């Protein structure tokens, strides 16, 4: 087992029972890879005291999807919806309400597989980040990082330590999150 496998989990395809849907080869418009040059932009998104109040409600009302690919790069995007009947036009983002789903028909959500580099289907671990100021009473970690991805975060073998290691990577870039680990059922 490699050092990366021990730290972040093994690289594997999406959980078989969920698979990857045909529309999930389309990358989200909001897709960004965590790196030195993108970290300031990502930090500004997660700052609830933004100078531009026009955009303040957006981060606190949506889920941010994240995934670690096989080369240990972390990719993030809003959970976007597309209309496959309109040339895959982005029509919005899903609100963070757990019951929120795109309307039936030609509207589809872009899930975790869409965050991977083109042609890749394997990842180490994935989840969501959402605004939860009550999770950390100190008020320093207003956002919560989870492993809630049915295809990449809740597979057998995914551990709390893997999610803690992901938190550590974000912290290296000045991004501090509380954490909620969901134990895989398989």
Residue ranges and their predicted role:
Residues 1-186:
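Eukaryotic phosphoinositide-binding membrane-targeting regions
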């Amino acid at each position: 087992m490699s050092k990366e496998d021990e730290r972040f989990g093994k690289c594997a395809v999406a959980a078989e029972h969920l698979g990857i849907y045909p529309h999930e080869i389309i990358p989200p418009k909001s897709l960004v890879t965590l790196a030195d040059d993108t970290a300031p932009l990502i930090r500004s998104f997660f700052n609830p005291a933004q100078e531009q109040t026009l955009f303040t409600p957006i981060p606190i009302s949506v889920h941010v999807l994240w995934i670690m690919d096989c080369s240990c790069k972390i990719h993030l995007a809003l959970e976007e919806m597309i209309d496959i009947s309109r040339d895959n036009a982005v029509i919005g983002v899903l609100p963070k309400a757990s019951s929120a789903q795109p309307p039936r028909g030609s509207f589809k959500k872009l899930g975790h597989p869409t965050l991977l580099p083109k042609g890749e289907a394997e990842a180490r671990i994935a989840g969501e980040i959402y605004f939860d100021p009550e999770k950390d009473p100190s008020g320093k970690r207003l956002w919560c990082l989870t492993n809630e991805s049915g295809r990449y975060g809740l597979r057998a073998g995914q551990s709390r330590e893997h999610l803690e290691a992901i938190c550590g990577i974000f912290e290296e870039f000045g991004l501090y999150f509380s954490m909620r680990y969901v134990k895989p059922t398989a």
